[in-house]
Amino acid sequence: MTLVQANLIRIIDEKDLKKKGVARRAGITAQTLSDILMGRRVIRADMVPALASAVDVPIPELFRDVEKGA
C-alpha cells in the first residue's frame, strides 16, 4: 500500500466521506477510485491535486507519514 493510498483511505474514513462523492469531485469514476484504494490502479501524479481537493486537504497531507508523525 502506498503512502498516498493509505492517507486517502484514512482521510475518507475520518471525514466519513462517501467514496462515490469523492470520485465525482475528483473527476474520476467510482470504479477508478475503488481500484486506487484497493491497490489495483496506480495513482498518477496528475490525479493527486484532484484527489486532495476531493477530500478537502492540502496536497502535502496525502504524502504525510502519519505513523512517523511527519
List the predicted regions and their residue ranges.
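A short, Lys/Arg-rich alpha-helix, primarily the initiator
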Residues: M1-K18
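Small-residue (primarily alanine) positions within well-ordered alpha-helices
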Residues: Q5, A23-A26, A52
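Short, charged recognition helix plus adjacent turn
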Residues: R10, D16, D35, S53, ...
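The DNA-recognition helices of helix-turn-helix-type DNA-binding domains
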Residues: T29, R40, V66-G69
